[in-house]
Amino acid sequence: MKTLKNLISLIILTVCAGSSAFAQNTPEVKLDVPYVPTRPAVVEAMLKLAKVKSTDILYDLGCGDGRIVITAAKKYGVTGKGIDINPERIKEANQNAKEANVTGKVNFETANLFETDFSQATVVTLYLLPSVNLRLRPILLKQLQPGSRIVSHDFDMGDWKPEQTIEVDGATIYLWTVPAKK
């Protein structure tokens, strides 16, 4: 069942990627992952699973419209950063932050995830494809401090077993805590 659900998610992500490429009038940006927004109930569950608190610094990788970072700032007082390779998504995220009155708590940047420093983050959220999660895993483990939490919507990190997995609104959410450095 889980494999079928992941297959359906991959198909939806692929279809959305194809249709959004035709709809945009901006120069083509090479995307590793299509933009599919995380539903509000899933955003709330991700933040709750990570036990987000006001002292956390949350990074959302592939932030899209910024909804996870913005929700964390509004609900928990978190300082956050959203990173996306698509400048149109960053423009939208900045507008959403302005409308939510959280521009002093959040920022968004257009960047390549594989060339970004995550070392300040205490919580990392992501809704990326399995292949991207696997490429990011060694970077996150190297850069993040022990005790930092990683929460993924729908896709795991290969053979790194999550500490906790929950189902919310048809989505699977995974939680890992960065272990002590060896």
Predicted regions, residues:
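S-adenosyl-L-methionine
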Residues: 2-12, 21-56, 87-120
